[in-house]
Design a protein with these regions (language model features):
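Thiamine diphosphate
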Residues: 1-133, 138, 146, 155
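Conserved small/polar residues in nucleotide/adenosyl-binding loops
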Residues: 174-176
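Residues in well-ordered beta-strands of folded domains
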Residues: 111, 142, 171
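Arginine/glycine-rich "motif VI" loop of SF2 helicases in the C-terminal RecA-like domain
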Residues: 103, 162-164
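Active-site/ligand-binding-proximal alpha/beta "capping" segment
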Residues: 148-154, 158-161
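Flexible, glycine/charged-enriched surface loops at secondary-structure junctions
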Residues: 165-171
Length: 176
């Protein structure tokens, strides 16, 4: 049996690892608690880390979450395997582009650290308010309950979107 490599990581690092391996482009705009995913991917790209396709991931940091979703849509239209990372209000700003992406059957994965929607004051507690607002967009959803599930189901999301051409929201509350 081959030697297994065990690492200790949080859900953000697990999702970022899989996203990096399965993506050619990552459109990012950091928003807590999903910021570490984008930071990991940006760092690995700068270090020249190779993905499953033998290339480094092209990282585009955008001016807003809406811009990141627009960049994802454009990149997908050009034929690149693309992903993004977001949470909370950031995900809500991506909804208009999500309808376009799903309607055009463009395969992609949005990795979401599910978080409470803030109303009058900042709230960083985890819940599913943000992703439930996206139910009607046409994106399939996978939800994880542990870091191991994040690692496993992130790969499932990337493979399933390629096979089905249905975009996925890969969500978890495991960001701490």
């Amino acid at each position: 049996m081959a030697n297994k490599k065990f690492i200790t990581c949080d859900g953000n690092q697990a999702a970022a690892h899989i996203a990096y391996m399965f993506s050619e482009v990552a459109a990012i705009y950091p928003i807590t608690p999903s910021s570490p995913m984008a930071e990991h991917v940006d760092e690995w790209s700068a270090q020249g880390r190779i993905n499953l396709f033998g290339d480094t991931v092209k990282v585009q940091e955008m001016q807003s979450e809406g811009g990141a979703a627009g960049a994802v849509h454009g990149s997908l239209q050009a034929g690149a395997l693309t992903t993004t990372f977001t949470a909370s209000q950031g995900l809500l700003l991506m909804i208009p582009n999500m309808y376009k992406i799903a309607g055009e059957l463009l395969p992609c994965v949005f990795h979401v650290s599910a978080r409470t929607l803030a109303s009058h004051s900042l709230c960083i507690f985890g819940d599913h308010q943000d992703v439930m607002a996206c139910r009607q967009t046409g994106f399939a959803m996978l939800c994880e309950g542990s870091v191991q599930e994040v690692m496993d189901l992130s790969a499932v999301a990337h493979l399933a979107t390629l096979e089905s051409r249905v975009p996925f929201i890969n969500l978890s509350l495991i960001h701490i």
